[in-house]
Regions:
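Conserved nucleotide-sensing/catalytic segment adjacent to the nucleotide-binding pocket
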Residues: 44-90
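Pre-Walker A (Motif I) flank of P-loop NTPase domains
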Residues: 1-3, 69
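A glycine- and Lys/Arg-enriched "phosphate-lid" helix/loop adjacent to the NTP-binding pocket
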Residues: 89-159, 172
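Hydrophobic anchor at the beta1->P-loop junction of P-loop NTPases
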Residues: 6
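Conserved lysine of the Walker
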Residues: 14
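P-loop (Walker A) phosphate-binding loop of NTP-binding proteins
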Residues: 9
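Conserved substrate/cofactor phosphate-moiety recognition/catalytic segment
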Residues: 19-62, 164
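Active-site flanking residues adjacent to catalytic metal/cofactor-binding acidic residues
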Residues: 31, 74-76, 111
């Protein structure tokens, strides 16, 4: 089983690319639990919600891992929960990082916020490119610090599609 994670700031194409990859390569796609959580609770999140959101994301991931697909595509993982918690609330539950480091991921596709427009969808909150660049930089710094396999994805939508497909194709060879 190969596990690919789409990482990076909001509105950089993670969900779109995850769907494109799954449609082309097959496997199982795990979505963002936080979106489900917000829809179910009909409110913004607060710091006290972070453990439930992170555990929900882990549960979805673990259910998919148990099926042992050849390819598991994660629209997000605990890094996003960890960084959003720090961004929005200045802190995060201490167990998130060790739990993230305890898991194996074969490839992180880290999407840059540059060269694509921000799109409001009712849940996004970083319309300014500078904020999304800070989130991208924090993601990259964490992945590099912890020697996680990553491929930075840049450019317009077509370029992102090509880069992501090539990276996953190489992983599956």
């Amino acid at each position: 089983m190969k596990v690919v994670v789409l990482a990076g700031p909001e509105s950089s194409g993670k969900s779109w690319l995850a769907e494109q990859l799954q449609a082309h390569f097959g496997g199982i796609l795990v979505g963002e639990y936080v979106r489900y959580f917000i829809e179910q609770n009909a409110r913004d999140t607060c710091f006290d919600d972070i453990p439930a959101i992170a555990r929900g994301q882990l549960d979805w991931e673990d259910q998919a891992r148990a099926l042992r697909p050849l390819l598991l595509i994660l629209d997000t993982h605990l890094l996003s929960n960890m960084l959003w918690s720090k961004t929005l609330f200045g802190d995060c539950p201490p167990w998130l990082e060790p739990e993230l480091l305890n898991r194996h991921y074969d490839l992180h596709l880290l999407l840059s916020p540059d060269d694509v427009e921000w799109t409001q969808d009712g849940q996004r909150c970083q319309p300014f490119l500078a904020d999304r660049q800070l989130f991208f930089n924090a993601s990259r710094q964490w992945l590099e610090l912890h020697q996680q396999p990553l491929q930075v994805i840049t450019g317009d939508w077509h370029a992102r599609h090509l880069q992501a497909f090539n990276a996953v194709k190489q992983l599956l060879v």
